[in-house]
Amino acid sequence: MKLKWTLFILLTLIFTGCKQEEWKDWKIHNEAWLVQNATKEGIIKTHTGLQYKVIRPGIGNQRPDDLKQVLINYRGTLITGIDANGDLIAGREFEVGKQTVMGVNTVIAGFAEGLKKMHKSGKYILYIPYQLGYLGLGQGTKGTMGYIPPYSTLIYEVELIDVF
């Protein structure tokens, strides 16, 4: 238990002591951010490391599974696109989807896991560690819109409109 608290304090100091332009190790910074985020009110953490917050629980008993398709609204950002209240900052998204249809089994592991927890008309914020995202590979081309650096925590605001 002491080790966990020591690690938490150390990571918190690293996180709060750095400015964005001073980040030397993006992986460590993202891991520290997730440790701090997990302590916030309303954050639920799964055994895989996915964290999520229920904004609106949704209705009914039907949840998506790997064989389903979903109709969703979503926005995605990195930890640099979140304000102090945990809200996504407009204009800092790497991805903004309108009403989009996608297969649950066609997305990254953390996004699929989050979708499977939702009910129709529900709205969640998913905090996806790099292990459930793009790993150490990243996504896209550096310097272009939509680029996701390696080891990035991905944050998605997702509204589940329909399941079919």
Where are these regions (language model features)?
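Cross-family detector of peptidyl-prolyl cis-trans isomerase
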Residues: K2-T6, C18-F164
